[in-house]
Every structure is written in structure tokens, then in C-alpha cells.
């Protein structure tokens, strides 16, 4: 199905099932411990062996010798897999570094061996006996040190210029010129990376934890140099990903190599301390913002430049993209700079680009509003735009940023805010309020599905879409139930299997909208088949209460299956609407913090997010996404930072004892409001994504609240005690 014109009225608009706050249909499986994750397919692997990864102890250089003799002789050990005995390997298109290193070492803890044994404990013990010898090369590990060496943008991301920024900024009545930094961050998903591989002749089945089934399958086949049709990926349940499981990782490749070597199933899991250095992370940024406004507060010039680092062949953190679209302004400049760093691979983490970009932009906007003497909410409203500032002919399909800010200000009690920093106290606590705009583009990907009408009247949905804790099972079932007029309980959904039609997968906030659109497309075809089977006109038929009705005639759905189950397979492909219209999602984030006047401890007291993100397919699962994102934004603002050893090139705090994330005691009262934002330009579902929007802007709102509480402007995240303590006002 080609979606190339705005959606008209369709069966989804009935909103009998879609748009309702249904509980997650996979909830009972997860709460009873019967949902099986990648490492838990025990019945399929009664004789499984276990692999333990040995990682490089240097960040850059060469492996000069690898002695595995002692490990090989240890109890229970089967083979030790290394680059020298693994056979010829390629590299997946979406991998920056090779997943099995040697002799060249590209980053710290790049896998150099896998010890395979009868038990996990034997494999782990034997891994400590592997002796590696290296020749260490000098590496680059500090973005600040490498910044000056990077003066040109990457070839495929040139600077963007509109109007005359330099002239407009020079003559601006009010201006801000400041630098902001965000640190390297880790995904820290609850479930670690894990895989189990089984070969049957030349056919590989891999149970793994991966967000994008088709990407994983394609890159694994390429790396192993086997036909893609010989690889099957199964990933029905995923314990969080946040972008860290978008791509093929070393656990999957090494499990496949080991299983081929021992001719039996092999399980490989990355222990928590291995994940930050062995996999990917959100790269640090150094961002320079210059914004100018006229006497009335209208922005006349805006420049956002961002530096980030990555391994050779890697991509930059696109932290400037929201600054191209969020606010009006005739004169604009954005640019990315990419330094070569020898740290582990930088790649996507929840809301790549916008999340760190808004951490800087939305502080700068507050600073400029203060200089202009305008309330920060009103300043954002004053500078709203309904068109792409770089192309006045291109309008937003829907843009309710003003409504988000107005609704949020009223609900939050913004009018009671004291605009003078450091003036509100609650005992020993300084109290402040902050606001930030949220923005995330609406990305679209082709997505397919297969839908069966069974002879007993139930409906089965099959797609390789994944559920990373987001509620995919439920919203896909709601879509099929709405389209075919059956109760939600009569729909079974099967996900995460490469034998199913290729979906958009889970990433980039595109999963909900595009995967449900794929199911919609398959159901449109199935409706036609059902109508034809019972002799009805498909165009004049309605589906409700388990029946198909055409005028005065009706039939029970399962009557259409007299000749056996009916199956429809279809995909949704998006046309030029995304080029004709700018499609984005918007939010207003409001935060109250308390800062202890003596210790500098920051406590977030309450949070409010008002979101405009298309039709909300399930308010309950969508709210869960947003409050989780708000919590992640709190972590980014106040505690999360991968500490870099810039002598040896690795992340020091590579476990959850050293890398702090918010816990239940940190989470305050959280409220979420969804505006009616049904968007016929986005898809037949008229929906968009919301799981990343809930993060975008939160950290800056907290930073702005800390400033309002204390008068201390922190531009370097995270906002830790050391950045506040010696600047706090005297305790009275």
C-alpha cells in the first residue's frame, strides 16, 4: 500500500479499540516470568554450551600474541574462538568496528576471544587464563583536545546556512553566545545483550535481543559470508534497548561462530561491566550556540554548531537538527564537526541528535529570554513558526507547540513562579521552576505484516516488529481488532521473527506509527478477501462485533474461512508527503526542583509533560513511554556520565555501581497530558511516535529550574554537586 495522500476517514477512526487505554496483553507473561527472553530458550537448547568474551585490554594498537593454551586445558572448555580460527569474516554495514578484533585493535574491550565451555562458570573461569600481549599505539580520547583539529564538516553533512547569520547576529539587540557540553552516556537497558545460536546444517537460528530484526539478519549474514536466507533471527521479548540493540553486536556473532564450531547450541551474554566498552554509547558533545533577537524578543539570528567524536568511519551526533526547525528566525547557521576518537563506538541512543541538542538549545533559549526580559514560556511562544524556517513553502503537517506550552503553564501553575532566581525557599531547600520545549521529528519507514483470519474466528498478526517494553504487542492487536471488528481478546500477535514480514522495527520513534500502519494495510487486504468470500461488496461492507455487514445482510466472520484460513500480507510505503510537509512532534516540559541550600543536592519534585504527537493509539502504554523518558531525562540532567580515562581510552564507570541512573526514590510526581493531535498527513493511523519526545527537552527544563532555584547557570552536564556547592547563596 502506498501512502501518498492525506488519510481520509477509515475504520481506525471508529476508535472502539484503538485510542483506548488497554492493559498490555503481554503483561501477564512478563509479571509471571513466562515471557522468554534471548537467554531463556532452555527447551530448545538442553545441551547448550556457554561462551564468555575476552575483551582487549588496550584501546588502540595491535595484538602481538594470544596464548589460549591454559584456557584450552581448563575443566569443561571446548574451543576458544579467535580471529585466527574463526574463518574469513566481513563487517556488517551498520557496524563501525569489527565485532571480533585481532590482530588490529580498534577500541578498548573489543572482543578478541570467546572461551566456550560446558557451563557459564567454567567459561568465565577459563577466560581469565587467556594471555594477550599487545603493542599499544597512541590514541585520541578527549573531544576537547581534538576539537581544534576539526575545522570542516563531514562530507555527507555540510553546514546549512539561511540568510546572513553573521550580519544579523552582529546587529542583534539581545544576544547569547555560550558553549554547552553533554557527556558520553550509556543505554543501561535492564536486559543485557544476549544470544543463543543453533546451526542445522548450513542454516542458522539465532535467538537474540535486538530491536531491528532485518538489520541484524542482514549484517550477521554479511559478516559470516552466508546467504541471508540461511539466517533466522528470533527476538520476541526484549528487556529494553534505547538504541543500544539496534545493530548486530558481538554476543550474536560470537554465539554463531561458536555454535558452528562445536555443532551444538551456544549461549553468549555480555556481563554488565562489559557492555559500555564492548557495545555502543551516546557520544559526548561540545555545542556552541549564538542566538540574537530584536528589541521585541523575536529571534533574528540563530547558530548552532556541535562537535562530537567517533571511531574512523563513524558518524557524528546530529545535535543541531532541532535548531533548524524549532524556532523562527530569518538568518540561520548549523554545522556538525566530527573528531576521530579511539573510544568505543558512538551510535544511536534514545532520540539521537535531538536529546543532547535540546539539552543545550533550551538552556540558551532561557538565557536569551532572561536577557530580553521576557517570560521563558512567552518567549518560546513569541518565536513559534508554522513553516520550515529554511523553506517557507513547506508547512508543518501539525504543530501544537504553543498549545503544549499554554496547557502546561496552566496545569503546572507557571504564573505563580518567581522569576527572580534564589528567592523561593522551603525550609533548607531552594525551590525553582523550569520549562523547555520538546521536539522530535516524525520518521517514517516501510513496514509489513501478515494477518490471518482463522476458521474459529480469531485473528493472528505476524510481523518481525519488536517489543522493547513499549507496548507493540498491544497496539498491533488493537489495530487488527479495530480493522476487523473483533474483540481485542480474539487477536493473537506474534513478533520478532525474521520468518515474518519485514517491519520498520523499534527505533527512532517510528515503530508505533509505521508498524501499526503495516498491520492496517494487511487488514485492508484481508477485509477485501473476507467480503469476497461471503459475496459482499468490499467497498460497502462494515466490520463489527465479529460480523461483516452489507446493507441488510450480515455474516459471521469465520463463515469466510469455509475453505480454510484466509491470509493477507501487505506493507505500507510512504510517498512524498514527508517532503511536502514537515512532520514533527512537540512537547512542553515543566519541572520543579529543590536544591539543598547547604549540600547542593538536587531533588526533582514534580514533572509535567504536555505532548502533541499525533493520534495516541493507547494512552496507557504511551504514558508509560513518556514517564520512562522523563526519568531518563532526569538521569541525563543530574547524574549520567561515562567517565573517560583519557590516558588509556576506556570508560571507567562501566557498571551500575559507577554509572548512576535514577532509581525509584529519585522519581517524583509525574504527569502526562496528550493533546488531540490527529494528523492525516502522517499515516492511515494518523499517529506519530512519542517515546523519544518524552525525553527531548527534559534535561534542559531541569537545568533551567536549578538556575531559577539558585541563580547558578550550569552549562556542562550532568549537574552534580561540585558544580553548585561553592556557588550557592549564603544560608540565612
Curated annotation (Swiss-Prot):
EC number: 1.2.99.6
Protein residues bound to Mo-molybdopterin cytosine dinucleotide: 241-242, 468-470, 511-512, 615-621, 625, 688-691
Classification via InterPro entries: Ald_Oxase/Xan_DH_a/b, Ald_Oxase/Xan_DH_a/b_sf, Ald_Oxase/xanthine_DH-like, AldOxase/xan_DH_MoCoBD1, AldOxase/xan_DH_MoCoBD2, AldOxase/xan_DH_Mopterin-bd_sf, PaoC-like
Gene Ontology molecular function: any one: carboxylate reductase activity
Keywords, alphabetical: Metal-binding, Molybdenum, Oxidoreductase, Periplasm
Pfam families (alphabetical): Ald_Xan_dh_C (PF01315), MoCoBD_1 (PF02738), MoCoBD_2 (PF20256)
Subcellular location: Periplasm
Predominant cellular place of this UniProt entry's protein: periplasm
Active site, per annotation: 692 (proton acceptor)
Necessary cofactors: Mo-molybdopterin cytosine dinucleotide
Family note: Belongs to the xanthine dehydrogenase family.
Quaternary structure and partners: Heterotrimer composed of PaoA, PaoB and PaoC.
Function as written in the Swiss-Prot or TrEMBL entry: Oxidizes aldehydes to the corresponding carboxylic acids with a preference for aromatic aldehydes. It might play a role in the detoxification of aldehydes to avoid cell damage.
NCBIfam families per UniProt: peri_hyde_PaoC
Name the UniProt record assigns to this protein: Aldehyde oxidoreductase molybdenum-binding subunit PaoC
Amino acid at each position: 500500500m502506498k501512502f501518498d495522500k492525506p488519510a481520509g476517514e477509515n475504520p481506525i477512526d471508529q476508535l472502539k479499540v484503538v485510542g483506548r487505554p488497554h492493559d498490555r496483553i503481554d503483561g501477564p507473561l512478563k509479571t509471571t516470568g513466562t515471557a522468554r527472553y534471548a537467554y531463556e530458550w532452555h527447551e530448545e537448547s538442553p545441551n547448550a554450551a556457554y561462551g564468555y568474551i575476552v575483551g582487549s585490554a588496550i584501546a588502540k594498537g595491535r595484538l602481538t600474541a594470544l596464548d589460549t593454551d591454559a584456557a584450552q586445558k581448563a575443566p569443561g572448555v571446548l574451543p576458544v574462538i579467535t580471529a585466527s580460527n574463526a574463518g574469513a569474516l566481513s563487517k556488517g554495514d551498520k557496524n563501525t568496528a569489527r565485532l571480533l578484533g585481532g590482530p588490529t585493535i580498534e577500541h578498548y574491550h573489543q572482543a578478541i576471544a570467546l572461551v566456550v565451555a560446558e557451563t557459564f562458570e567454567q567459561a568465565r573461569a577459563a577466560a581469565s587464563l587467556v594471555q594477550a600481549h599487545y603493542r599499544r599505539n597512541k590514541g585520541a580520547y578527549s573531544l576537547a583536545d581534538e576539537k581544534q583539529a576539526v575545522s570542516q564538516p563531514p562530507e555527507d553533512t555540510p553546514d546549512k546556512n539561511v540568510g546572513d547569520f553573521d550580519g544579523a547576529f552582529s546587529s542583534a539587540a539581545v544576544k547569547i553566545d555560550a558553549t554547552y557540553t553533554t557527556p558520553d552516556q550509556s543505554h543501561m537497558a535492564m536486559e543485557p545483550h544476549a544470544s543463543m545460536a543453533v546451526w542445522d546444517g548450513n542454516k542458522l537460528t539465532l535467538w537474540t535481543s535486538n530491536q531491528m530484526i532485518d538489520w541484524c539478519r542482514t549484517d550477521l549474514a554479511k559478516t559470516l559470508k552466508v546467504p541471508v536466507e540461511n539466517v533466522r533471527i528470533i527476538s520476541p521479548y526484549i528487556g529494553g534497548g534505547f538504541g543500544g540493540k539496534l545493530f548486530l553486536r558481538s554476543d550474536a556473532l560470537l554465539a554463531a561462530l561458536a555454535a558452528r564450531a562445536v555443532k551444538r547450541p551456544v549461549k553468549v551474554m555480555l556481563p554488565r561491566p562489559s557492555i559500555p566498552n564492548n557495545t555502543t554509547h551516546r557520544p559526548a558533545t561540545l555545542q556552541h550556540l549564538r542566538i540574537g533577537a530584536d528589541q521585541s524578543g523575536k529571534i533574528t539570528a540563530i547558530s548552532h554548531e556541535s562537535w562530537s567524536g567517533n571511531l574512523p568511519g563513524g558518524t557524528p551526533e546530529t545535535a543541531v537538527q532541532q535548531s533548524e526547525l524549532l524556532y523562527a528566525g530569518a538568518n540561520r547557521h548549523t554545522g556538525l564537526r566530527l573528531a576521530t576518537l579511539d573510544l568505543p563506538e558512538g551510535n544511536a541512543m534514545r532520540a539521537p541528535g535531538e536529546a543532547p541538542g535540546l539539552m543545550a538549545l533550551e538552556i540558551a533559549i532561557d538565557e536569551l529570554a532572561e536577557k530580553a526580559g521576557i517570560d521563558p514560556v512567552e518567549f518560546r511562544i513569541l518565536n513559534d513558526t508554522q513553516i520550515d524556517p529554511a523553506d517557507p513553502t513547506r508547512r508543518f503537517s501539525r504543530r501544537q507547540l504553543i498549545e503544549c506550552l499554554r496547557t502546561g503553564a496552566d496545569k503546572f501553575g507557571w504564573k505563580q513562579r518567581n522569576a527572580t532566581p534564589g528567592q523561593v525557599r522551603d525550609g533548607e531547600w531552594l525551590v525553582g521552576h523550569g520549562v523547555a520545549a520538546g521536539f522530535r521529528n516524525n520518521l517514517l519507514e516501510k513496514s509489513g505484516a501478515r494477518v490471518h483470519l482463522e476458521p474459529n474466528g480469531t485473528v493472528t498478526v505476524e510481523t518481525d516488529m519488536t517489543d522493547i517494553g513499549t507496548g507493540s504487542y498491544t497496539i498491533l492487536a488493537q489495530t487488527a481488532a479495530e480493522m476487523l471488528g473483533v474483540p481485542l481478546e480474539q487477536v493473537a500477535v506474534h513478533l520478532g521473527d525474521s520468518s515474518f514480514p519485514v517491519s520498520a522495527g523499534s527505533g527512532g520513534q517510528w515503530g508505533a506509527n509505521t508498524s501499526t500502519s503495516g498491520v492496517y494495510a494487511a487488514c485492508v487486504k484481508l477485509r477485501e478477501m473476507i467480503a469476497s468470500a461471503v459475496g459482499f461488496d468490499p467497498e460497502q461492507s462494515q466490520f463489527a462485533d465479529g460480523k461483516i455487514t452489507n446493507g441488510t445482510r450480515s455474516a459471521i466472520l469465520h463463515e469466510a474461512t469455509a475453505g480454510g484460513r484466509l491470509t493477507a500480507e501487505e506493507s505500507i510505503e510512504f510517498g512524498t508527503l514527508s517532503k511536502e510537509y514537515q512532520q514533527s512532534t512537540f512537547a512542553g516540559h515543566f519541572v520543579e526542583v529543590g536544591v539543598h541550600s547547604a549540600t547542593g543536592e538536587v531533588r526533582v519534585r514534580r514533572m509535567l509533560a504536555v505532548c502533541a504527537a499525533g493520534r495516541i493509539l493507547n494512552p496507557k502504554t504511551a504514558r508509560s513511554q513518556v514517564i520512562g523518558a522523563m526519568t531518563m531525562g532526569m538521569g541525563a540532567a543530574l547524574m549520567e556520565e561515562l567517565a573517560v580515562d583519557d590516558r588509556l581510552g576506556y570508560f571507567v564507570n562501566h557498571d551500575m555501581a559507577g554509572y548512576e541512573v535514577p532509581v525509584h526514590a529519585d522519581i517524583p510526581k509525574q504527569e502526562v497530558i496528550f493533546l488531540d493531535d490527529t494528523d492525516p498527513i502522517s499515516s492511515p493511523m494518523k499517529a506519530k511516535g512519542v517515546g523519544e519526545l518524552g525525553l527531548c527537552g527534559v534535561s534542559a527544563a531541569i537545568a533551567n529550574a536549578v538556575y531559577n532555584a539558585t541563580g547558578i547557570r550550569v552549562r556542562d552536564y550532568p549537574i552534580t554537586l561540585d558544580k553548585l556547592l561553592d556557588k550557592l547563596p549564603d544560608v540565612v
